[in-house]
Amino acid sequence: MRLYPLVWLFLAACTAWGYPSSPPVVNTVKGKVLGKYVNLEGFAQPVAVFLGIPFAKPPLGSLRFAPPQPAEPWNFVKNTTSYPPMCSQDAVGGQVLSELFTNRKENIPLQFSEDCLYLNVYTPADLTKNSRLPVMVWIHGGGLVVGGASTYDGQVLSAHENVVVVTIQYRLGIWGFFSTGDEHSQGNWGHLDQVAALHWVQDNIANFGGNPGSVTIFGESAGGFSVSALVLSPLAKNLFHRAISESGVVLTSALITTDSKPIANLIATLSGCKTTTSAVMVHCLRQKTEDELLETSLKLNLFKLDLLGNPKESYPFLPTVIDGVVLPKTPEEILAEKSFNTVPYIVGINKQEFGWIIPTLMGYPLSEGKLDQKTAKSLLWKSYPTLKISEKMIPVVAEKYFGGTDDPAKRKDLFQDLVADVMFGVPSVMVSRSHRDAGAPTFMYEFEYRPSFVSAMRPKTVIGDHGDELFSVFGSPFLKDGASEEETNLSKMVMKYWANFARNGNPNGGGLPHWPEYDQKEGYLKIGASTQAAQRLKDKEVAFWSELRAKEAAEEPSHWKHVEL
């Protein structure tokens, strides 16, 4: 009987420490959801976590290759305490990416389904009060073909910075981006899902303690690309108020096309569908089971370098399309016309974007640690679908990047710099300049740090690889073991910059190294073991590639100018 006082003491302590005695239940427009409280070491106030809230109807049957529809209402308390399935994708690729990028200590068991339009919410708010905290909506990466929301646990960012974190899912691969280039299957379904999730945030986030008038969208890689596309999209107007693109912007040409017909025909053919008309293709593909489409997907060899085929007929990505809806015109035209959502914007890259993870996943033969001139040029041509460097320009590019060395090891490093510049560095600076020139507050960063959590297979020389900043942004040192004080402080600093920006459109604040705005002086922040301002990120590279592309366009008028939209 003597236990009773202890039990009461425990319950009293729980309540005193802000740990409510019953789990959180929140009203959404469609029905009530039940979450759970998680306590983070060092924080009295727990974070309420809701996993797998539906923001659209399952995109099945006739809703495959169709815009997302509103979720059906429910009249019970929906249990949202377990991870939703990730969108259909190659399970091996999805698993690898999740294990490489997660900030969790333990890997979560992954499930995949075509029924995947769910989001997760992490809120530090006292749900009995009317809080209006800044909202940060995360769009995951994975080349628009793999990935999921639950890889990224939002509790640390939420607790440390007192913000509501929402992680969203969107259709991927064939399901998300199949486009016949006409009304039968316009494409960009994945982006329409992202817009639908932002509408859900506007309608519901206030009940989770969030302020729908202060929404920051942020994402990495294809997620950063998606953020950049939403900045340009009229559909997303007023659905967010600031944006952060980490290692990916809409000028990354591998992920965008004006002509989706060839890849649509390829998908239909690989699926055993006739390609006589768009309507026939779409009807046939809608009849396929999820597994059959997955089989087709695997045959496409997405995100792989094709060393054998004709580079002009290789499709390693299922890209976003200029559909006249999500993107009314090409990104270049929208940026030039300054007709986009001029919200405050952080754009950044990592020091070695093509350091290890991307070349490894894509199957680049770089493991020997050296490249001769002939192989380097051949790889540039084989990379045409990703880099879009014409055969004629390869000697010019090779001379510019490798001309000064005969050392095959150095040449390999320079080859990796070249690919990183084309895929990430140059497009990021060009987007930032356009944003700045349209009068919107713009901030740039370059991240250079090797997290302690990365794969042991990765060479020690790779510092600031693609995805390395994720461990800082999502507070890995507070969930995983083994981080140094330096790494822990770096994560605190990055979370503070990101959340300051979410709060007021400027990352600066007390105790942080000053981050200059990206203006005509082109000041930016180098983030790493020592964090300091610098100037003119990649300006020489941008000058070289701009001139080269202009020359290319003059000699060979780009076919997209004549494509009927």
Curated annotation (Swiss-Prot):
Top-level class of the enzyme under EC nomenclature: hydrolase
Leader sequence residues: 1-18
Key words, A-Z: Cytoplasm, Disulfide bond, Endoplasmic reticulum, Glycoprotein, Hydrolase, Lipid degradation, Lipid droplet, Lipid metabolism, Microsome, Serine esterase, Signal
Modified residues (N6-succinyllysine): 382
SUPFAM superfamilies the UniProt entry points to: alpha/beta-Hydrolases (SSF53474)
Broad class of where this protein is predominantly found: endoplasmic reticulum
Positions of glycan attachment: 79, 489
Catalytic reactions of this protein: all-trans-retinyl hexadecanoate + H2O = all-trans-retinol + hexadecanoate + H(+); a carboxylic ester + H2O = an alcohol + a carboxylate + H(+); a long-chain fatty acyl ethyl ester + H2O = a long-chain fatty acid + ethanol + H(+)
PROSITE patterns attached to this UniProt entry: CARBOXYLESTERASE_B_1, CARBOXYLESTERASE_B_2
Record EC number: 3.1.1.1, 3.1.1.67
Motif (Prevents secretion from ER): 562-565
Residue positions of the active site: 221 (acyl-ester intermediate), 353 (charge relay system), 466 (charge relay system)
UniProt subcellular location: Endoplasmic reticulum lumen; Cytoplasm, Cytosol; Lipid droplet; Microsome
Pfam family, one: COesterase
GO CC annotation: cytoplasm; cytosol; endoplasmic reticulum; endoplasmic reticulum lumen; intracellular membrane-bounded organelle; lipid droplet
Stretches that traverse the bilayer: none
Keyword Hydrolase listed: yes
Listed result of changing residue 186 to R: No effect on the hydrolysis of PNPC or PNPA, no activity on cholesteryl oleate. No effect on the hydrolysis of PNPC or PNPA, no activity on cholesteryl oleate. Increases activity on PNPC compared to activity on PNPA
GO biological process, one term: short-chain fatty acid catabolic process
CDD domains registered for this protein in UniProt: Esterase_lipase (cd00312)
Subunit description: Homotrimer.
Record family assignment: Belongs to the type-B carboxylesterase/lipase family.
Role of this protein: Major lipase in white adipose tissue. Involved in the metabolism of xenobiotics and of natural substrates. Hydrolyzes triacylglycerols and monoacylglycerols, with a preference for monoacylglycerols. The susceptibility of the substrate increases with decreasing acyl chain length of the fatty acid moiety. Catalyzes the synthesis of fatty acid ethyl esters. Hydrolyzes retinyl esters.
Identification of the protein by name: Carboxylesterase 1D
